[in-house]
Amino acid sequence: MVTVIDPQLAGVSGNMMVGALIDLGAHPERTAEVMEDAASHFGGADVSVSEVKRAGLRATYVDVRADESLSVGYLEFLRLLEGISHPALDDEMLSMARAVFHTIAQAEASVHGVKLDEVHFHEVGAADAVADVMGAVFAYFDLNLHRDEVYTLPVAVGGGLVRGAHGLTPVPAPATTEILRGFPVTGGPSGVELATPTGSALLVNMVREHRRFFPPMEIQATGYGAGSMDPEFPNILRIVRGSGQVPHDTVTLLETNVDHLSGEVLGNIFERLLEAGALDVTLTPVIMKKNRPGQLIRVICRENEYERILEHLFSETGTLGVRIFPQVHRGVLERRIMEAEVDIKGRRTARFKVGLMGSRVVNARIEYEDARRISLETGIPLRDVIEMSEKQFRDLKFKADQENDGSGGLK
């Protein structure tokens, strides 16, 4: 399953996350019960779940009213947190909750220049924040999202100034800025705080990676969590869940046109780029300006390696410009090496590179070294060995499927 958290319009807060997860299908009464029980260790809170509208859109709103606000040191906070033992919470949930608060504590320590054990929780130590985190974590596991591929879109952070325990600070708050380090953010669409430290810490601990756009998926359910304000735009956090259509990842595509390089230099560039970590390199003949023949060099690389590959491309080609296409979606089948026996002048073992979509074999190619070995042993031309081997593999796989037996001669 694939889940996308969408905070690009109204940001993310703790109660918005809980509301969106409940709206997606988490148990509302049990979630509220967990929240109130957790808050009781920090002064207590009342939790209510209701359906509201924000700028005309329906959403679930979770209202948490704390009886009092605690201001505690991080170590004392952890001690109080250890006292939470609701029967609906297991060790994995409690571990994730601790990770969320640790994320906040690390951010606070960084922005204030203190050690972790010197961090003092103010707003985050309040019962409502504890309720939000425990409720969000419970709902997350209640929906089994911990087994999904979870992504986030860019986070709207708002703007202006916000008053906290340390007086006025710019939006996003320093702790929020630290928590969202490495994640794409956008300002606005209003001059208020839209991304809170609690909501941001939940987000970064829930997601696998960030994306600018939705991944390929078949949408099955959507949940909307409302914020407390009702401005002119929909103040909601959206969570979308569905099934992945094809296994996929994202890569960066680099390309440039050259018309001044010899075949020897182009061959060397090809090898150097692959050695530098490029996933694939292609050279395509093109006609350039003034009808000059040239080459289009295309390089596919991992997103976190494109700058290094880009440097190699500039230095090796001497080109003055490279087109960069970030976040290119690429369908990728699961790849596996399987062994099978083939009958080519006797029974012989060969390895096949197999592409799988789920449990279904979509593609199979004999490994070149094994095909060459069989060709040398039998005197049969290589292309015939490849054709015969792959046909036998397909027949063997078909027979195994018919017998509903996963082995069928395949290892």
Curated annotation (Swiss-Prot):
Gene3D superfamilies: mk0293 like domain, Transcriptional regulatory protein pf0864 domain like
Domain of life the protein comes from: Archaea
Signal peptide: none
Keyword flag Membrane: no
Keywords assigned by UniProt, alphabetized: Nickel
GO MF, one example: nickel cation binding
Pfam families according to UniProt: Ni_insertion
InterPro entries assigned to the protein according to its UniProt record, in alphabetical order: Ni_insertion (IPR002822)
Keyword NAD: no
Protein family per UniProt: Belongs to the LarC family.
Protein name stated in the entry: Putative nickel insertion protein
Organism: Methanothermobacter thermautotrophicus (strain ATCC 29096 / DSM 1053 / JCM 10044 / NBRC 100330 / Delta H) (Methanobacterium thermoautotrophicum)
